[in-house]
């Protein structure tokens, strides 16, 4: 059963919009839909065309992979200790709780591991919801991808933010990290993030989880929050719990209390997990699958 759950999670979290995908300096607006009120219209086509947040009270509505975001806030593209990447995606939107969390976390990074700051990947679309490419989650404004590459001690150009690749920490055989790229600084950052009370989970590649299990010393309780899943070899994924004032937000069940470093982790390196059979494509999600409040979010001016 756990193997089946893990395979399902792979589909929930992975997708083509990974940190190493290039962006564009000249993003083209999407053409209008011929019949946006058609019940069969994929929800991603509707939310993917929303270019500004819904001017409503901040609320995360629904579940991480089946919901939307009211009153989203933009993480500024530049901060003292962060820079937003792939600006052409317009995915630097989040619940104000996530934006505040990233600002506070980034300010601590130089003390945590000596990096100048964080390179921030995808958060959510302006109104959350399903995305045209990539992530099945990131719909509530409570998920954020952080590159496994230190922020340079300078401002990146727009072209660099669209074209440079993140650092792949995982060996080609996917069995462990690349010792030439994985550093104690990665462990220190992931440990600091997982210890934050607001953080519900931190998703990393199984090979990175294996390295953390091997190298962590002292208090290891934080390892329970670090969950393995495929992808996530160029970035790690922060997930916050439902914030106050979001009564329609549904949190995940707490992760198991164990470190997740024994047989539970070993399963990820079996042939069935390393070489899974392709699954059948799922039909795209429509608005009927989302909470009714998401219609109000889309309809807001």
Describe the role of every protein-language-model region:
Residues 52-120, 182-189, 196-199:
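Active-site acidic/histidine clusters and adjacent loop/turn architecture
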């Amino acid at each position: 059963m756990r193997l089946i759950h893990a395979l399902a999670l792979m589909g929930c979290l992975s997708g083509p919009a990974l940190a190493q995908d290039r962006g564009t300096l000249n993003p083209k607006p999407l053409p209008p839909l011929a019949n946006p009120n058609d019940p069969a219209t994929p929800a991603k086509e509707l939310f993917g065309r929303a270019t500004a947040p819904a001017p409503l009270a901040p609320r995360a509505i629904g579940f991480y992979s089946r919901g939307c975001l009211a009153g989203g806030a933009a993480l500024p593209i530049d901060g003292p200790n962060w820079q937003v990447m792939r600006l052409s995606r317009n995915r630097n939107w989040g619940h104000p709780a996530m934006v505040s969390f990233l600002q506070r976390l980034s300010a601590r990074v130089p003390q945590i591991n000596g990096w100048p700051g964080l390179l921030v990947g995808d958060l959510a679309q302006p109104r959350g919801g399903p995305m045209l490419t990539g992530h099945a989650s990131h719909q509530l404004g409570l998920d954020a991808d952080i590159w496994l590459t230190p922020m340079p001690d300078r401002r990146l150009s727009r072209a660099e933010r669209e074209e440079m690749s993140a650092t792949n920490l995982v060996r080609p055989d996917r069995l462990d990290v690349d010792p030439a790229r994985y550093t104690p600084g990665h462990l220190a950052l992931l440990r600091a993030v997982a210890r934050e009370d607001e953080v519900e989970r931190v998703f990393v590649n199984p090979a990175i989880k294996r390295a953390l299990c091997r190298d962590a010393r002292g208090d290891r309780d934080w390892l329970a929050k670090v969950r393995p899943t495929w992808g996530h070899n160029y970035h790690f994924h922060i997930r916050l719990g439902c914030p106050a004032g979001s009564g329609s937000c549904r949190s995940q069940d707490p992760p198991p209390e164990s470190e997740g470093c024994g047989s539970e982790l070993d399963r990820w390196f079996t042939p069935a997990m390393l070489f899974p059979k392709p699954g059948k494509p799922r039909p795209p999600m429509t608005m009927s699958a989302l909470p009714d409040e998401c219609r109000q979010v889309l309809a807001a001016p």
